[in-house]
């Protein structure tokens, strides 16, 4: 009996030890699992911060490939050192940007007087004019009360609305990450959180557009009608000039700005829409300076000195404009969207077409660049300006056909 009782007691002790060991193993596994979950959350949070940091650093944003964490931190340190060396925390938000002896109002007046333009703020979500300085009256003949709260798209020329919407868009501010699936070796579409697709303060914008000009009886400034075209006769243009809207070419220079703090990702999804709406374009609008200071003489016997005003254009093999630099607006008066799709022969002087046709034929046959003679190019006000161009044809290596012609145009005054 005693032996049997002893064996039973030993079995009970072994069962208790087994249960203790099992519970100990279970607790260890739970601790490891909890530790793994904590580490995963920590890594996810770190990756989120690294992605946010890379979206704010211009050097990281310019890279096409996905950067590792150490590279992002290194570029962030370099960017902060550069900002510290510039003397302000931010080129637009720094508190030391304004001299201490000037008030904000005085600084604004000095900037507007120096630029001979007007300051305006437009919301990027709906194009609403949030602010406009009173100096707009000297440029557009409209008062501050006329434009404040109105839609900017109602003031713009209809053909310029699409271009302006591109300038208000902030989609290019999203991180450019190209991930490759290790199994299929195909690019993987990554859903970037909308909170990361915000505006980086200081994203610069510079473009030309046409704004509606309020007519006045004593208006002596140069105007243009939205119904005028180079292909219409002067009779139709004169008859419609009094009835159509008047527009003025405005050069807009500024930057995109977001004035609200970025919300955390764990907040409600409906708050993302409010975050994207709180962004705006802060810009100064002014009349672009006229490069031309004299009219072109009837003959080109005496060649003037070259003026280093260059603009680039790209043409099809037939001579149609596929692209033109914005600097051309300062020279010829046409906006890029007005001249694209038209042939450059429409703007050449009749007496220069024969020589330019020979240059056109030559550039289609030789791989070297071809320099044209000094020729006359028709501007928007129907006057002529002297240009000289270097044409070079780009041939597709696969089809041996000419894809386009690159032109470097120099202004002669």
Curated annotation (Swiss-Prot):
Record note on disruption phenotype: Cyc mutants don't display PER and TIM cycling, and are completely arrhythmic.
Residues in coiled coil: none
SMART domains linked: HLH, PAS
UniProt entry tagged with the keyword Transport: no
Tissue specificity of this protein: Expressed in head and ovary.
Domain bHLH: 30-83
Segments of skewed composition (Basic and acidic residues): 20-41
Cellular compartments annotated: Nucleus
Assembly, per entry: Efficient DNA binding requires dimerization with another bHLH protein. Forms a heterodimer with Clock in order to activate PER and TIM transcription.
Protein name: Protein cycle
Organism, scientific name: Drosophila melanogaster (Fruit fly)
This protein's encoding gene: cyc
């Amino acid at each position: 009996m005693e032996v049997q009782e002893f064996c039973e007691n030993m079995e009970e002790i072994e069962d208790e030890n087994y249960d203790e060991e099992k519970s100990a193993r279970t607790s260890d596994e739970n601790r490891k699992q909890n530790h793994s979950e904590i580490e995963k959350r920590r890594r996810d949070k770190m990756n989120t911060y690294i992605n946010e940091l890379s979206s704010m650093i211009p050097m990281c944003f310019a890279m096409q490939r996905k950067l590792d964490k150490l590279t992002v931190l290194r570029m962030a340190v370099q960017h902060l050192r550069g900002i510290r060396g510039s003397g302000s925390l931010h080129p637009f938000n720094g508190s030391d940007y304004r001299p201490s002896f000037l008030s904000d109002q005085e600084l604004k007046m000095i900037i507007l007087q120096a630029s001979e333009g007007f300051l305006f703020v437009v919301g990027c979500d709906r194009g609403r004019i949030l602010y406009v300085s009173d100096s707009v009256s000297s440029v557009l003949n409209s008062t501050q009360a006329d434009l404040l709260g109105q839609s900017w798209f109602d003031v713009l020329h209809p053909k310029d609305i699409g271009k302006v919407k591109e300038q208000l868009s902030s989609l290019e501010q999203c991180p450019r990450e190209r991930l490759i699936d290790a199994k299929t070796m195909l690019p993987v579409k990554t859903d970037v959180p909308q909170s990361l697709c915000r505006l980086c303060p200081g994203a610069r914008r510079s473009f030309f557009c046409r704004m509606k000009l309020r007519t006045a009886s004593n208006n002596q400034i140069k105007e243009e009608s939205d119904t005028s075209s180079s292909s219409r006769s002067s009779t139709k243009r004169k008859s419609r000039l009094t009835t159509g809207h008047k527009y003025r070419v405005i050069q807009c220079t500024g930057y995109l700005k977001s004035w609200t703090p970025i919300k955390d990702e764990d907040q409600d999804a409906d708050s993302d829409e409010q975050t994207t709406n709180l962004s705006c374009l802060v810009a100064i609008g002014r009349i672009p300076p006229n490069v031309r200071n004299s009219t072109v003489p009837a003959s080109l016997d005496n060649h003037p000195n070259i003026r280093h005003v260059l603009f680039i254009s790209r043409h099809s093999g037939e001579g149609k404009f596929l692209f033109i630099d914005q600097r051309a607006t300062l020279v010829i008066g046409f906006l890029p969207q007005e001249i694209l799709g038209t042939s450059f022969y429409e703007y050449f002087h009749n007496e220069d077409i024969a020589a330019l046709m020979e240059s056109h034929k030559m550039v289609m046959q030789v791989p070297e660049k071809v320099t044209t003679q000094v020729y006359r190019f028709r501007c928007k006000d129907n006057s002529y300006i002297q240009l000289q161009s270097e044409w070079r044809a780009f041939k597709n290596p696969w089809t041996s056909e000419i894809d386009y012609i690159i032109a470097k145009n120099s202004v002669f005054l």
